[in-house]
C-alpha cells in the first residue's frame, strides 16, 4: 500500500527550524509527502530540507511574491513525469500545483 501524507506547513523554513520537518520522514516513512504553503524561494531552502535521503523532491514557487504560497512533493520512487500548474496563469504563477505520474497512479499536490 502507498503511504501518502499531506501537510499544510504554513512556512516550510519555520517548520524545519523548529525541528518538525525531517523527523516526519523517519517516524512515518511516507512514500509520498505533499506540502502546501511552503512560502520559500529556491535559494532559501537549506540542503537538509531540499535533499532528504531516499527521496526525490519537487517544488513549485510563487513567481509573483517572495515567500508566498508554494507547494512541494517528496517521493521515494522517481516519477515517470513531474508537472507544474493547472493551466490557469493566476494560479500557476502563484506556485499552487505540483504533480507526479507513476506507473500505477498520479498524485497532485495543490491548494488554494
Language model feature labels by segment:
Residues 1-52, 63-68:
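N-terminal, active-site-proximal structural segment of metallo-dependent hydrolase catalytic domains
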Amino acid at each position: 500500500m502507498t503511504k501518502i501524507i499531506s501537510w499544510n506547513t504554513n512556512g516550510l523554513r519555520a517548520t524545519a527550524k523548529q525541528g518538525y520537518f525531517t523527523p516526519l520522514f523517519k517516524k512515518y516513512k511516507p512514500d509520498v509527502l505533499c506540502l502546501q504553503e511552503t512560502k520559500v524561494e529556491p535559494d532559501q531552502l537549506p540542503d537538509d530540507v531540499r535533499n532528504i535521503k531516499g527521496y526525490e523532491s519537487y517544488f513549485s514557487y510563487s513567481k509573483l511574491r517572495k515567500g508566498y504560497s508554494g507547494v512541494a512533493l517528496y517521493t521515494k520512487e522517481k516519477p515517470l513525469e513531474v508537472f507544474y500548474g493547472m493551466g490557469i496563469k493566476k494560479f500557476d504563477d502563484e506556485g499552487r500545483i505540483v504533480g507526479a505520474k507513476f506507473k500505477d497512479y498520479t498524485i497532485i499536490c495543490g491548494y488554494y
